[in-house]
Swiss-Prot record:
It comes from Mycobacterium tuberculosis (strain ATCC 25618 / H37Rv). This is Glycerol-3-phosphate dehydrogenase 2. Belongs to the FAD-dependent glycerol-3-phosphate dehydrogenase family. The gene is glpD2. GO terms for molecular function: glycerol-3-phosphate dehydrogenase (quinone) activity. Its cofactor is FAD. One of its GO terms (biological process) is glycerol-3-phosphate catabolic process.
Length: 585
């Protein structure tokens, strides 16, 4: 897709949506010299959505992220893009309807290359009441979804449920209900939202940490930033600043020296990843627990199983899973499996934090059960809470609150009509997968894999291999991915470190038993020419990544959060100049 807005000095053969080294240098210069309408803090899905919403209203936008795009909550979800079936028990009908509308919109229009339909089985284990109770809930869920791109529910006897999921324990099953929902690679989706914002003119820069809020009297007029790579500092001026930092909301709020309208509480959610052959099933599963639900979701050649829900008051950047977390997940899922899972079956584990609203203060906040928008100081807007699926609505609400500080008339949100990069032409390319594969010497399944990660941007990815066909070969110890995907992550997707690539642009860190260690050097050598790494840089990146994996694995054997956090914190930061926490003075 061609870019209609070319930044000054940005024409290096790549569009502005390509978040590579050249764009990064230009972005730093622009941040320190230009006046912006909106400065967004936070490169998660909500912050990226805010940047896209504001840019497509015609505003001049800057987005700064202290670490990597989606490095927090937005890469560590259950990978569900759903309405929230469990919220119906809480009678949150309006919220579920809103989320289901967003699901339909992304599935059909905004991001069909990233958001995918998936059949789920709800195993029934209670003899008389469970089927009508769950069926009524799923029926309402289907009806609230409105326009249908997925089939309605279907009921099964025990024999029928076992045909769908032969791996279930026969003695604990009386039947099942199949329904459809959708899944997404959250990190890739978030990165694509940010790149789409850049396509429409937003200045997007990672490793750019906010360390101060600039003030003029009682009004916030911008932010002080620090480069997390080299410690350089700059001031970024904007008519309004949007705090979309999730679990870091209170930390940024503290920089304003104003009392916040709400506080955010971090809740830890842990997932485990096991090979597909450990659970024999043709469908995903949703299991009831005492407090919530547990998802068993197919993920390529694996299953993702989770989640937990416990308070977390330690390191926000690196939440750690414990042995107790993993035991809880295994115990829950093993209650319905014919062949129990063990710790030895696990290929990957990840922990993320949900930003939950802990309370709110007055009527100036726009509040809902799901998210809240507030104006804690003139020129400062904060948004928190919510769920991944409704990121677009959250972003529109935040920018609606921000426009009062912009000295010009501002158009309403139009992101309902703005497809993400890669969506345009996706369905046609799926039909042409065999032809594309023949031209590139790739198997059609490999082309479809690329299409489901890049959509119509596949042409940009493959173009990188035109001068070096060896990039089309698989990564030796992670053959599910091509070398060119690593190179493209560095050249166009904002990746600056090995961790960014192995954990977020690709999911090697959770999809292989070695968690990326065995392919770290190979991938580092592929991206070194793109990022200008020396041999010493390669050695440092590999060592840092291996230390991260070792710390995570050791922490996952600990009995409690405190001991797990201490071990995880022992690994060095990939971004050497990151400040954690930001000093308030």
């Amino acid at each position: 897709m061609s870019n209609p807005i070319q930044a000054p000095d940005g024409g290096q053969g790549w569009p502005a949506a390509a978040l590579g080294p050249a764009q990064r240098a230009v972005a730093w210069k622009r941040l320190g010299t230009e006046q912006f309408d909106v400065v967004v803090i936070g490169g998660g899905v909500v912050g990226s959505g805010c940047a896209l919403d504001a840019a497509t209203r015609g505003l001049k936008v800057a987005l700064v992220e202290a670490r990597d795009l989606a490095s927090g909550t937005s890469s560590r979800s259950s990978k569900m893009f759903h309405g929230g079936l469990r919220y119906l028990e809480q009678l949150e009908f309006g919220l579920v309807r809103e989320a289901l509308y967003e699901r339909e919109l992304s599935l059909t229009t905004l991001a069909p290359h990233l958001v995918k339909p998936l059949p789920f089985l709800f195993p029934l284990t209670k003899r008389w009441w469970e089927r009508p109770y769950i069926a009524a809930g799923i029926f309402l869920y289907d009806r609230l979804g409105g326009a249908k791109s997925v089939p309605a529910q279907r009921h099964f006897t025990r024999a029928g449920a076992l045909r769908l999921s032969p791996g279930l324990k026969r003695s604990s099953l009386i039947g099942g209900i199949r329904y459809y929902d959708t899944v997404v690679d959250d990190a890739r989706h978030t990165m694509t939202v940010a790149r789409t914002a850049a396509h429409y003119g937003a200045v997007v820069r990672c490793s750019t940490q906010v360390v101060a809020l600039l003030r003029e009297g009682d009004r916030v007029i911008g932010v002080g930033v620090r480069d997390s790579e080299n410690g350089a500092v700059a001031e970024v001026r904007g008519h309004v600043v949007v705090n979309a930092t999730g679990v870091w909301t209170d930390e940024i709020q503290a920089l304003s020296k104003q009392r916040g309208r709400f506080q955010v509480r971090a809740s830890k959610g842990v997932h485990v990843v096991v090979p597909r052959d450990r659970i024999v099933s043709d469908v995903a599963m949703i299991l009831r627990t005492e407090k919530s639900v547990m998802f068993v979701i197919p993920w390529g050649s694996h299953w993702i199983i989770g989640t937990t829900d416990t308070d977390w008051n330690l390191d926000l950047a690196h939440p750690a899973a414990t042995k107790a977390d993993i035991d809880y997940i295994l115990g829950t899922v093993n209650a319905v499996l014919a062949t129990p899972l063990t710790h030895a079956d696990i290929d990957g584990v990840y922990a993320g934090l949900r930003p939950l609203l802990a309370g709110e203060s007055d009527d100036t906040s726009k509040l809902s059960r799901e998210h809240a928008v507030a104006v804690p100081a003139a020129g400062l807007v904060a948004i928190a809470g919510g769920k991944y699926t409704t990121y677009r609505v959250m972003a529109a609400d935040a920018i609606d609150a921000a426009v009062q500080f912009i000295p010009a008339r501002v158009a309403p949100s139009i992101t309902e009509k703005v497809s993400l990069l890669g969506a345009d032409g996706y369905f046609a390319l799926v039909n042409q997968a065999e032809h594309v594969g023949a031209l590139q010497g790739l198997h059609p399944y490999r082309v479809r894999h690329l299409l489901d990660r890049y959509g119509s941007l596949i042409s940009d990815v493959l173009a990188m291999a035109a001068s070096d066909p060896s990039l089309l070969s698989p990564i030796t110890e992670a053959p599910g991915y091509l070398k060119v995907e690593a190179a493209y992550a560095a050249a166009a997707e904002g990746a600056l470190h090995l961790e960014d690539i192995l954990a977020r642009r690709m999911r090697i860190s959770i999809e292989y038993p070695h968690r990326g260690v065995d392919c770290a050097r190979e991938v580092a050598e592929v991206v070194a020419p793109v990022l200008g790494w020396t041999a010493a840089d390669i050695d440092r990146e590999v060592a840092n990544y291996m230390a991260r994996v070792e710390a995570e694995v050791l922490s996952q054997a600990q009995p409690d959060d405190v001991s797990a956090d201490m071990l995880r914190a022992s690994a060095p930061e990939a971004r050497a100049e990151i400040l954690e926490p930001v000093p308030l003075d």
